[in-house]
Amino acid sequence: MVIGGGHAGVEASIVSAKMGAKTHLITLLIQNIALASCNPAVGGLGKGHLVKEIDALGGVMGVITDKCGIQFRILNASKGPAVRGTRAQIDMDRYSIFAKEIALNTPNLTISQESVESLIYEQDSKGRYIVKGVTTNIGKTYFAKKVILTTGTFLRGLVHIGETKLQNGRFGEMSPQNLSNSLQDMGLTLGRLKTGTCARIDGRSIDFSALEIHNGDEKPPHFSYKTINFSPTQLPCFVTYTNENTHKIIRDNFHRAPLFTGQIEGVGPRYCPSIEDKVNRFADKSRHQLFLEPQTQEAVEYYINGLSTSLPIDVQEAVIHSIKGLENAHITRYGYAIEYDYVEPTELYHTLETKKCANLFLAGQINGTTGYEEAAAQGIMAGINATLSLQNKSFTLARNEAYIGVMIDDLVTKGTKEPYRVFTSRAEYRLLLREDNAYLRLGTYAYKFGLIDKVRYTQIMADKTHIEHTINYLQNHHITPSSSNLTMLASLGLPPISDKALLIHIVGREELDCALLRTLLTHLGITDVESMSDLAIEQIFIESKYFDYIQKQKQQIGQMRQMLQVEIPRDFIFDNIPGLSLEVIEKLKKFTPKSLFEANEISGITPASIDVLHLYIHLHHKKKSQILV
């Protein structure tokens, strides 16, 4: 049973059905399945990695985005592949239509339009709650072996537009007010978070001649491995800026802003602040950049990215009309803030099942995250784990395996007091977690769970074999500056060498297109180049270019694995260890882990804390050995 048909709910319900579980999705409005409530875009820095990982695991977000995207770009294209991010503007109407089409045509999956009012549960002999099903607003009762909550911003949702407050989970949609009570009654810790959205304006009322144009890439990237012959029709976005007059209007109305009057209690997203928050916090800035993003292929409405606000409607109108190009803009939908309940994610196992309530899984904004991609990634993991748990199995991803693993580990071990979003900087091993190798990292899991077919799996394994054999050859063979080799390098436009060099350093020296790289590899003695896919060739180049750094990160992972095997002495005292917070010390004393591996599994114990513990265990052993001497 999946509750909520947003991005998390869609991935959770489809993946569980594909794995063979009879699945039922309950959502408030079927026509709003996977609706893009905020900006009409998917991907970006860090977020693009999540979409690629979802796709590699057999999810649908990448497929849908490629089908309905109206602009595609690579962000950070001038930087290394580890920090690049694919981003697409989407037709938000078609996105929802395609998601609904996939869901309604997925075997084992049924859907109904209702609102869940409460959870059905009981307690076992040890006092742990066991969730059995749900009751809905139309008097129906559903029993299920597993329940996944993907409620988004709908748990006691409260919309703010100036002084006006509406009990909505999204503007115009009702908000379940009682479901949170079930969670609290079972002992789960709830908090309040806040997010917001921008006004939308009629494209016919915009003066585009006054704006900067922002086009997609000439060679548009795509998200899904299923996408072939990709040539989408792309629409431009447009750039404009706030100005001093805009800021004066906002400052003059701080006293009417729910964010500052105390009307809003929830904590908002740090990396997506409202315009009133930006004007207040960055008083020295004379302008803020805004992007006008088309919401559909027809470009009827535009989303003003960067102008999230909950100011009163008359102030919103004055603010928008003070901006260049928008002097006569007609507002079709006003911006608003929304507060909602979330469950403190330290209440979860890494499988996304709640610790206090058996059979209950949570995914998406209910876990304190923000963003479609973060929600979808949790949804697919919750769906996989809920299904596997029927066989007493589970599936988790480590921090060195996927950004999904980084995100879930952050949430479960550290918790969050503000909406959490993924960044590449959150990953310790980001050179290993690139967008381009997501299918290699996760494809085997997808095949194991029946989420990709044998043909796709065979392709993945062939690529893996080609890459491993080629990299192994390149790192163990050299090239000399002979006349024939210098001639060969010159013919490919490559600089000469003066000394003997490893082949892997030659391959990774210069940016080459796929055809030239194939020619170079053939000259260097690789015999099966023609049978390699373009993706494998790309991987060989990237692995060669960053070979030394990648090897270093792999060594760090090996060292971490060894470190986690270290046992904690029985007489080891956690008190007063420099570098450990009081909270960490209290948890270590409470759970008394026998090893660093067990310590690492405790919620709130960070990798940095493990490093400190490892050091002081070493010093403890050293001190004892000195005493014995």
From Swiss-Prot:
UniProt entry keywords in alphabetical sequence: Cytoplasm, FAD, Flavoprotein, NAD, tRNA processing
InterPro entries: FAD/NAD-bd_sf, GIDA_C_N, MnmG, MnmG-rel, MnmG-rel_CS, MnmG_C, MnmG_C_subdom, MnmG_C_subdom_sf
Co-factor(s): FAD
Residues noted as binding FAD in the record, renumbered to the chain: 4-9
SUPFAM superfamilies, alphabetized: FAD/NAD(P)-binding domain
Single GO BP term: tRNA methylation
GO cellular component: cytosol
Localization per record: Cytoplasm
Major location (coarse): cytoplasm
Matches recorded under Pfam families: GIDA, GIDA_C_1st, SAM_GIDA_C
Binding-site list for NAD(+): 268-282
GO MF, one example: flavin adenine dinucleotide binding
Similarity comment: family membership: Belongs to the MnmG family.
Function: NAD-binding protein involved in the addition of a carboxymethylaminomethyl (cmnm) group at the wobble position (U34) of certain tRNAs, forming tRNA-cmnm(5)s(2)U34.
NCBIfam families: mnmG_gidA
Quaternary structure and partners: Homodimer. Heterotetramer of two MnmE and two MnmG subunits.
UniProt name for this protein: tRNA uridine 5-carboxymethylaminomethyl modification enzyme MnmG
Annotated gene: mnmG
